[in-house]
């Protein structure tokens, strides 16, 4: 029991469970005895009915639309805390990770487009390598233990949070279907209620979650991706402490283990099951997977390192205390672990086009993320062991 408690208390545990979930999905999707069960599980219909309201989705879509909204709620809470009290609370503190994140989104997207611009279908996946998997990246960093400077961990956390915020904006602007004005009106009303609750000082988290459920349903029906509702709710839950209690921090504390040990692993299990049947060298070297691998493995560290260098060169920001530029480059490589966030964007980009494209995209994401994890870990380990 003591060893189990120590495992779940470590920062690496979430990343390790993600790896196990993804490996299990790959195994089950490619074994004759289990592949049928795996796909049947994902296609299981689940119906929710409340009065006249009815939502019919298969298990995969419930995981991607509903459970991932809880993940984005946690992201919203973390972003709000960092903006108001943490590493993004002042312009001077925020400048370096913000500039790094911008470079880490622009360059991978451009590199992907260099491979896929001529194909109007695969071109839609330009945002896939722009994302970073916070849990996985922090998990790999945690494998190096106390040798990693605290400032470097905070930098990676801040960079990944801004990265996810950028991914949220990209999803809202570029990956929405036909919009329902009525549903958007209901969503706007729900947001107004959340704002009113916050202004009136309502501190009961359950009230925000209840209104958030209405918002999620309205956003789902509107054509905008439903997970965005989670971020919005997170922004409105009060952060300020009263009698030593903060509703936002308390909810963040409650949600974190559920997200790390259930929701993200379940998402990985549901989405990482790529069939290797029919995989050929020609397929692996086609523009879609190559663009994703290049974007994650080369574009991410190149964009982050280049923009950080420019920020330092023109004195727009400074290195986090106790870190070196070589260590920042290593963190840039780790940010190429797109995994869950990249798979999520791939499902939005190609979900209504061709299942084969999603399969190739996932394969590219898995290869690019794995290579980024191995190279980033090795590079940072060498930099930490190097004499100052």
Swiss-Prot record:
GO terms for cellular component: plasma membrane. InterPro entries: Na/H_antiporter_dom_sf, NhaA. It comes from the Bacteria. Keywords: Antiport, Cell inner membrane, Cell membrane, Ion transport, Membrane, Sodium, Sodium transport, Transmembrane, Transmembrane helix, Transport. GO terms for molecular function: sodium:proton antiporter activity. Pfam families: Na_H_antiport_1. It is found in: Cell inner membrane. The chain crosses the membrane at residues 14-34, 59-79, 95-115, 125-145, 154-174, 179-199, 219-239, 254-274, 292-312, 328-348, 360-380. It catalyses: Na(+)(in) + 2 H(+)(out) = Na(+)(out) + 2 H(+)(in). It is a multi-pass membrane protein. Na(+)/H(+) antiporter that extrudes sodium in exchange for external protons. This is Na(+)/H(+) antiporter NhaA.
